[in-house]
Amino acid sequence: MREIVHIQAGQCGNQIGAKFWEVISDEHGIDPTGAYNGDSDLQLERINVYYNEASGGKYVPRACLVDLEPGTMDSVRAGPFGQLFRPDNFVFGQSGAGNNWAKGHYTEGAELVDNVLDVVRKEAESCDCLQGFQMTHSLGGGTGSGMGTLLISKIREEYPDRIMMTFSVVPSPKVSDTVVEPYNATLSVHQLVENTDETFCIDNEALYDICFRTLKLTTPTYGDLNHLVSMTMSGVTTCLRFPGQLNADLRKLAVNMVPFPRLHFFMPGFAPLTSRGSQQYRSLTVPELTQQMFDAKNMMAACDPRHGRYLTVAAMFRGRMSMKEVDEQMLNVQNKNSSYFVEWIPNNVKTAVCDIPPRGVKMAATFVGNSTAIQELFKRISEQFTAMFRRKAFLHWYTGEGMDEMEFTEAESNMNDLVSEYQQYQEATADDEGEFDEHDQDVE
C-alpha cells in the first residue's frame, strides 16, 4: 500500500521532523507509545503509508533520523514522541559538520552515509509498494544541506524510479545562524535541481513574518516557526494519509505540479493562520479560506506571488464542506486573478478535499503553488553568494575539505540558470510558439 519512507537530516531537519511526527501521530490517533486509541476508521485506513505495524499492534514510523552530532537526536529521543521511533533508525556521528557543506557532503557525512543507507534500505524492504521518499532538512547548515543532498543522490542511484520529495528550509538573512549560509544553500540547490522531484521551499523569513505580523508574537521562537512548518507538512501530506476524492500520491502530485523537470520548487501556504492558543474562537467559511490561502501573507516562502505567475497550483481543503462550494471558490479566484496564472496551461489548479480537519479547527486549507515568483528567493541567495564568492571569503573552509572552486562556480551558474528559466516562463504567452519554431529551423 503506497508507503513513504521519511528521512530527517541535521538539526533543523530533526526538529521539524519530530514535530511532523507529533502532529500526524495525533491526527491518526497514535499515542507516544505507538498504540492506537483513535475514534475513526479513516485514521487507520491508510496508516501504513507512514507507519509500520509492529508486534503487539504498535505503530512505528517509517523514519530514519540522521545527524553528524548526537545532540539534536538526544533531544528528539527525550521529546514527547521520542519513544515512537525504532531505536536502530537513529544514525549519528560524533564530529559534527560545523555548518560546512563540504564536511556534510564529502568528508564526515560521506563516512556515515552507508550506515544511513542500510537503514533506508531496511525500511524500503519492509514496504509493500514503496512510492517514494521524503526528506526534511535545511539548506543553510552543514549536515542537512551537505549530507542531506548526498543522501538524496545516493537514494536516487538506488531507487531511480521512486519519487523524491523534500521539505527544505531556505536560509534568510533575518534569521541567520551562520555567515556561510549562502554558500551552503547554493551548493544544495545545485543538487536539488538535478535530484529531487518536488521540493517544498520553507523560508524562515516568511515564517518569521507570519508569526510577527499575523499571529502577533513579538518574539517568535523556533518552536513557533516549527509549529507553522508542521501544520503545512501535515496539510501537504493529507492526501497521502487519508482517503479522499482526489487521492494524490507523490507521483500524481508531481505530474500535476511540475511542467518542466527543473522547475519543481513549490511555495507552500496555509489557512487559517492561528497562533497556538487562539484556534477555537472563530470558524472560517470556504470563501474566506480560499482568499486567505492565496494571500501573499500566508506563503511560507518569502516571495510575493503577485510578482510572478503560477504555472500550477494544488489546494488541499480539510474538514466537512461542500465540494461544489470549494470548486466555485477556486474557479472564482482563477477568474478574478487570471493574469497571475499562465494561460498556456489550462486547468492548472487542482483541488483535493479530505473530511478530517486538523486538530483545533473545523476547516483548513493548504496551498502548494509552483510560481515563477520563487525566483526571488533564489536571487536573494545568489546575490549573497556572489558578494562573498568574488572576494573568495571563507572558501578555505571548503577547499580544505577537498572541494574545488570550480564547484562553486558551477553551482552559482546553475542557480542563475534556474532563475532565468523561471523568468522565461513568466514572460511566455500562449501565442509565442510560432517564434520558437522559426528559431529551430534556423539552427538546422
From Swiss-Prot:
Binding site for Mg(2+): 69
GO process terms (BP): microtubule cytoskeleton organization; mitotic cell cycle
GO CC, any one term: cytoplasm
Any GO MF annotation of the entry: metal ion binding
Classification via InterPro entries: Beta-tubulin_BS, Beta_tubulin, Tub_FtsZ_C, Tubulin, Tubulin/FtsZ-like_C, Tubulin/FtsZ_2-layer-sand-dom, Tubulin/FtsZ_GTPase_sf, Tubulin_C
Compartment annotation: Cytoplasm, Cytoskeleton
Binding site for GTP: 11, 69, 138, 142-144, 204, 226
A Pfam family hit: Tubulin_C
Keywords: Cytoplasm, Cytoskeleton, GTP-binding, Magnesium, Metal-binding, Microtubule, Nucleotide-binding
Acidic residues bias (residue ranges): 429-444
Presence of keyword Cell division: no
Family named by the database record: Belongs to the tubulin family.
Protein name, entry field: Tubulin beta-4 chain
Organism: Caenorhabditis elegans
Gene: tbb-4
